[in-house]
From Swiss-Prot:
Functional note: Probably involved in translation.
Upper lineage: Eukaryota, Viridiplantae, Streptophyta, Embryophyta, Tracheophyta
Any one GO biological process: regulation of translation
Single Gene Ontology MF annotation: translation initiation factor activity
SUPFAM superfamilies: eIF1-like
Keywords: Protein biosynthesis, Translation regulation
Family in the record: Belongs to the SUI1 family.
Designated name of the protein: Protein translation factor SUI1 homolog
Cross-referenced PANTHER family: EUKARYOTIC TRANSLATION INITIATION FACTOR SUI1
Matches recorded under PROSITE patterns: SUI1
Length: 113
């Protein structure tokens, strides 16, 4: 007898929710802010989904200066350009990009809270 309600544990993919569709079938333009564990207490904050016409290098430079952390822009095949910052900067990044006028508050999805 097999119980189909039991979920089999699988590996966690932090980018699995990147393509979210609404009721009309079109994808919403969300900016996803996630955290990934590295080794030990070290973590990495990723910002994905910013508009392509924005200057990622200027945004990264301002983020690094405002948050006092190191970071880089990574070009991913599936996700496009992703900003990576050292440390848990989820709240700081979300408030920064709203105050800078890059995106609106309702366009941000903060994951892993």
């Amino acid at each position: 007898m097999v119980d189909s309600d039991i979920q089999i544990p699988t590996s966690f993919d932090p980018f699995a929710e990147a393509e979210i569709t609404d009721a009309t079938g079109s994808t919403k333009e969300y900016v996803h802010i996630r955290i990934q564990q590295r080794n030990g207490r070290k973590s990495l904050t990723t910002v994905q989904g910013l508009k392509k016409e924005l200057s990622y290098d200027k945004i990264l430079k301002d983020l690094k200066k405002a948050l006092c952390c190191n970071g880089t822009v990574v070009n991913d095949k599936e996700l496009g350009k992703v900003i990576q910052l050292q440390g848990d900067q989820r709240k700081n990044v979300s408030t920064f990009i709203v105050q800078a006028g890059i995106v609106k508050k309702d366009q941000i999805k903060v994951h892993n809270f």
